[in-house]
Amino acid sequence: MSNTYQIYLISDSTGETLDRVFLAIKAQFKNIKYDVKSYFFTRTENQVSKIMDEAKKNDNAIILYTIVDTSLAKFLANKGDEKKIPCFSVLGNLIMNFSKLLNQKASHVPSGQHALNEEYYERIEAIQFTMAHDDGNLVEDVDKADLILLGVSRTSKTPTSIYLANRGYKTLNIPLVNEQSIPESLKKNPKLSCVVGLTTEPQRLVDIRKNRMNALKEKENTNYTNINKIEKEINEAKKTFIKYKWPTIDVTRKSVEETAASIIKIYEINKNNG
């Protein structure tokens, strides 16, 4: 029997939810070898049967699935029992338990989370706004932003902004060269929007900037990567954040998701105190 597990991901939609769940699972079992096969938009018994026949040919087959159509999900589970293949429904019990708790039947419509509702359009609008207001562009629109991120170069402003946009927040980010980088309207009214300063450890920033220069195949800019210059940049940025009473997040050992979660908490606090 092979020591490599054959993981089959079966979804009746885009598979986004399933991918995220499996990512979390495999992080817990780092020494396990596995191959992954993904089957998305699986919505018929014929499709399921073909996948199960394929899985049966492999040793150590495991199936994870997100299928909201109860009859199709039951068909898959029965096929798994028949062929002695372990099958795990990622959403089944969760939807059933929520249905009981809320005393309401679930719609069981695939891709329900992608319905073109008001929230969907708000997210699209947030993404468009954020892309147009990246890296100091259109800073005169600070009053239209839900969030404003400030920080010296390479403090994850852009990826964090894009992540926040996908969560529905119109985000504008500004590279902080000095205090003059900040729009006058924001200096006059620091609470005009929810402003968050991003900072990091100097040596970490040196490494990131050097990697950036290498990736672009550019000659090293001594001012851009000099530790003393960077320490001064960061200290000046911190002074600016303190002056205008803007909360600060150190992104040194944080993922984009962790940084964004902290920013959203700040936003919610500001909103509640608003």
UniProtKB/Swiss-Prot annotation:
It comes from the Bacteria. The keyword Kinase applies. Its EC number is 2.7.11.32, 2.7.4.27. Keywords: Kinase, Nucleotide-binding, Serine/threonine-protein kinase, Transferase. One of its GO terms (molecular function) is ADP binding. The keyword Kinase applies. It holds the Pfam family Kinase-PPPase. ADP binds at residues 151-158. It catalyses: N(tele)-phospho-L-histidyl/L-threonyl-[pyruvate, phosphate dikinase] + ADP = N(tele)-phospho-L-histidyl/O-phospho-L-threonyl-[pyruvate, phosphate dikinase] + AMP + H(+); N(tele)-phospho-L-histidyl/O-phospho-L-threonyl-[pyruvate, phosphate dikinase] + phosphate + H(+) = N(tele)-phospho-L-histidyl/L-threonyl-[pyruvate, phosphate dikinase] + diphosphate. Belongs to the pyruvate, phosphate/water dikinase regulatory protein family. PDRP subfamily. NCBIfam families: PRK05339.1. Bifunctional serine/threonine kinase and phosphorylase involved in the regulation of the pyruvate, phosphate dikinase (PPDK) by catalyzing its phosphorylation/dephosphorylation. PANTHER family: PYRUVATE, PHOSPHATE DIKINASE REGULATORY PROTEIN 1, CHLOROPLASTIC. This is Putative pyruvate, phosphate dikinase regulatory protein. It comes from Pelagibacter ubique (strain HTCC1062). The lineage of its organism: Bacteria, Pseudomonadati, Pseudomonadota, Alphaproteobacteria, Candidatus Pelagibacterales.
